[in-house]
Structure formats: structure tokens, C-alpha cells
Amino acid sequence: LDNDLFKGFKDHKTDGGNKKMFLWVTESRKFDGGAVDNIKKHLDEVLETFEQIWTHNDELLQLSPKFKWTPAYGVYIKDFAIHPKTKMASMITSNKRWTRQHEIRHDFAMANKDKIDVFGRGIQEIPNKEIGLVDYRFSFCVENDTYDTYFTEKILDCFATGTVPIYMGTPKVAEYFNTDGII
């Protein structure tokens, strides 16, 4: 395929030719760095430049049929399987405290680190997320932001390892997943 995929509108320069160009808007509203405003400001150019624009942002999805819904991120797990479970609960987090959800996640992890296994940047770093999920029956997942169309690898990685997510994120989680497998 002769295509280019860009994760930011301002980075959309190509080497020329007849490549089809696609834009993927991945960050939550709290971290988009003005991407949504920039896209709206240059909407005609965006629509002319890109074959499709993939996003979870409901505001952008209303602008044109070229905007297509997709989860904010994919899956970081390499070995999709329902693995045997030998441990009770984990949480993958970081020491970031930039948003309210970061604070909730961090405070919960620190308050419960003697009861659950806590992993993540600045806490107990792991080389891959499988280490913090594969052996665990449950994992606490708190998204960086909470709105209807936004969820990330935090919940998807649990499904990919057969781990039940204890989830704080989109209030419309039932529109995307069977909630019998989510707490």
C-alpha cells in the first residue's frame, strides 16, 4: 500500500507522489495540544489533504463523513489469550498527576499498594504490560479523561490478556463492550 499515516495535522508533510494520507487523532481532549481546534480552524485543508481522519472525538465526528470513529489507542499486548490466573489484582499507572484522573489513579494506587500489585513509570517499571496483566484476575483501569467516546489500551489490554478490568472511564462503556466482563 502506498499510504501515509499521520498522528498530527501539523506533521502532515509527505514526500510527494500519489500517496493516500490518513490522520489519526489519538489524544484525549486534555492532551490534544490544540489539535481539535487546529483541525476545525483548517477544516477545508484537512478534508482536502486526508482520505480519512480517524478519531474518538465526538465533536470532530460531526464535521464530515471523512471523520471515522476509532478507539483512542490500540492494544499493547503481543500474546492475545485468556491466560491462567495466579494472582488477584494489579494496576498499571504512573507518577503523572497532570489531570484529575491521574490524581485519582495515583492516589488509589499509593493507598492500595500493599493490597494490589502496582506497576508503571516512576513506581515499579516493567518492560511490557503483559507482566502487569497476564497473571492477574483483575486490574484497576482509570482513563486519563472521561467522556462518552473515549477509551484506550487501558481496558483493551485487559481484554487481550483475559484480565477483568475494574474500570473508570467512558460512561457509555456498555455501548462498546459486554459489561458482564467489566467491574
What kind of region is each of these model predictions?
Residues 1-183:
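Nucleotide-sugar donor-binding catalytic core of glycosyltransferases
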